[in-house]
UniProtKB/Swiss-Prot annotation:
Main location: Golgi
GO terms (BP aspect): protein glycosylation
One Gene Ontology term, aspect cellular component: Golgi membrane
Family membership: Belongs to the glycosyltransferase 31 family.
Species in which this protein is naturally found: Arabidopsis thaliana (Mouse-ear cress)
Top-level taxonomy: Eukaryota, Viridiplantae, Streptophyta, Embryophyta, Tracheophyta
Gene name of the encoded protein: B3GALT13
GO molecular function: hexosyltransferase activity
Topology term for the membrane: Single-pass type II membrane protein
Domain of life the protein comes from: Eukaryota
Protein name: Probable beta-1,3-galactosyltransferase 13
Annotated EC: 2.4.1.-
Amino acid sequence: MSSSPKLFHARPSFFTRRSTPLIVFTSLAIGLTGFLFGLSTILFPGLRLSGRSCLTNLPPKTVKIVWDVAGNSIVNGEVKRHKVMGFVGIQTGFRSAGRRRALRNTWMPSDPEGLRRLEESTGLAIRFIIGKTKDEAKMVELRSEVAMYDDFILLDIEEEYSKLPYKTLAFFKAAYALYDSEFYVKADDDIYLRPDRLSLLLAKERGHSQTYLGCMKKGPVFTDPKLKWYEPLADLLGKEYFLHAYGPIYALSADVVTSLVALKNNSFRMFSNEDVTIGAWMLAMNVNHENLHTLCEPECSPYSIAVWDIPKCSGLCNPEKRMLELHMLESCSKSPTLPSDDE
């Protein structure tokens, strides 16, 4: 991935027309066509063009974000950012169709209307975040899923485990370009989440505008190349990692993401692990670390926001099965947003 300065732009959600009047008849024909088209949009606001986006004030649910390496401005003009309280980007991959299916069958709405209702009730916009692959068969499958559910943001970056820090930076820049949000939440596709409780957490009054929310940890730096979390830059870190959030879910306030977006990509030190990389960047900023164990609970409780099998797995072990099992528990899916006074 190139380290040159990059910006994002979204593809327009419908086609624009250009017409040069050649003769009076052509001008009248075009004018009449435009009038009829405008009238149809008033009478039939649900009309869709190319099967992609409704002609309403709602933002497109699925947007492709591309790297602009040619210039220093957004090619198609400035994108109008959709206002939300929190944007949740669920990081997913090409081998995770089963996980996405499990999420849509449990805590995440499975259709655009459900996503809209969730946004209205909680202030949260939720989308899957995925890159690209050179495997055309997998891209065909993804395009089919996009057409069916319309709940993705597509990043123009290779989807590889070794590039997760780069994908994370691309995610925050893309989310910032599309959404005017108070918090930007990075979440994995193998956790059980309560959006209603997450909404309350993000809405809490804070005295510090630069906030880093997460279940914080420290631990030894892995220096064995055979281990999954091996860190080639271990010499820069010492024997123990600094305080940083577990990777399955954390959030950055708008001011923090604004600072990330303003920096050139080659300004960032990229460590092997995405959560460590973000934690290192937070050390360079005047952020408030907010440590929340409600974001890393192993079982559903009256206060749990995110549930996953800590410390055994970095997410739910066997998430496709566990997600459904948890959702069947009343303590997970049907308990009130706020605990009762006697709990």
